[in-house]
Amino acid sequence: MARQYRSDRLSQEIEKEVSDILRRRVRDPRVEGVTITGVDVTGDLQQAKIYYSILSDKASDDQKTKAGLEKASGLIRKELGSRLSIYKTPELSFIRDESVQYGDKIDQLLNKLNRD
């Protein structure tokens, strides 16, 4: 129970800090407009999956954003290490959150049904 509580709190802290780091420290234009939607940290606190969304639906924009995030992951991890008081900073992996596009698609279908 305590271990789960700690990983949940760390997930929330990482989400907040990564959003701030992307907004203030990362200068790469490929990661502009990225929104961090969630973070999952493993029970041993060694790995963190960071879920993000972007406004564009284009595959090329997704690839550019993913490449920008992967390139900036070293800086992000270093900044996290200095901001968080934990023994070892988790390894970061970035995964696109598809739920935003799915929700948008559902919304469009509902609007279409209401018009008909």
Swiss-Prot record:
It is found in: Cytoplasm. Coiled coil: none annotated. Pfam families: RBFA. Gene3D superfamilies: 3.30.300.20. Keywords: Cytoplasm, Ribosome biogenesis. One of its GO terms (biological process) is maturation of SSU-rRNA. It comes from the Bacteria. HAMAP family: RbfA (MF_00003). NCBIfam families: rbfA. Monomer. Binds 30S ribosomal subunits, but not 50S ribosomal subunits or 70S ribosomes. Belongs to the RbfA family. This is Ribosome-binding factor A. The lineage of its organism: Bacteria, Bacillati, Bacillota, Bacilli, Lactobacillales.
